[in-house]
């Protein structure tokens, strides 16, 4: 059985882990870690201590400012993507333990497409550039 790292829990809410195959469970935001526990298999869990968090990127829908999911990027172990029942409330609870400059907005489809379109002239120029 998994042992929680938190001594106090600020928020516990139903969530979906979007890593590979999706799994449903509960997210707990506490004083020492962000924790996810699978509801079907208690041995399937993710515990991310606050000092291991590099930054958190939230996917915000354009116009509505609704947060659909967020990803926690760690210093060593890659990233973990979650969607909770109320992502905004979850990130507000996380903000208590993570600096605000580490909470960033993830680029959406239009941002990525615009950046790619702006880079086309540079790519074409580099194709015909003679190297010394």
What is the predicted function of each stretch?
Residues 72-94:
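Canonical phosphoinositide-binding patch of PH/PH-like domains
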Residues 2, 35-36, 78-83:
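Short, surface-exposed beta-strand/loop "edge" segments at domain boundaries and coil↔beta transitions
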Residues 55, 92-96, 122, 126:
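Charged/polar, solvent-exposed surface patches and flexible loops
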Residues 88-116:
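Pleckstrin homology
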Residues 1-29, 103, 116-131:
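Anionic N-terminal interaction surfaces
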Residues 17-69, 75:
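Phosphoinositide-binding peripheral membrane targeting modules
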Residues 7, 46-48, 82:
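Generic detection of short hydrophobic beta-strand segments and adjacent strand-loop junctions
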Residues 9-12, 80, 104-111:
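Non-catalytic membrane-recruitment/adaptor modules and adjacent regulatory linkers
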């Amino acid at each position: 059985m998994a042992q929680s790292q938190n001594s106090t829990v600020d928020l516990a809410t139903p969530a979906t882990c979007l890593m590979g195959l999706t799994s449903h469970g509960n997210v707990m935001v506490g004083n020492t870690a962000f924790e996810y526990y699978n509801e079907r298999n208690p041995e399937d869990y993710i515990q991310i201590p606050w000092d291991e968090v590099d930054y958190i990127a939230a996917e915000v829908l354009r116009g509505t400012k609704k947060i659909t999911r967020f990803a926690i990027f760690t210093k060593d172990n890659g990233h973990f993507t979650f969607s909770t029942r109320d992502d905004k409330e979850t990130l507000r609870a996380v903000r208590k333990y993570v600096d605000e400059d580490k909470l960033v907005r993830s680029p959406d489809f239009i941002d990525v497409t615009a950046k790619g379109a702006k880079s086309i002239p540079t790519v074409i120029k580099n194709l015909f550039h003679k190297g010394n």
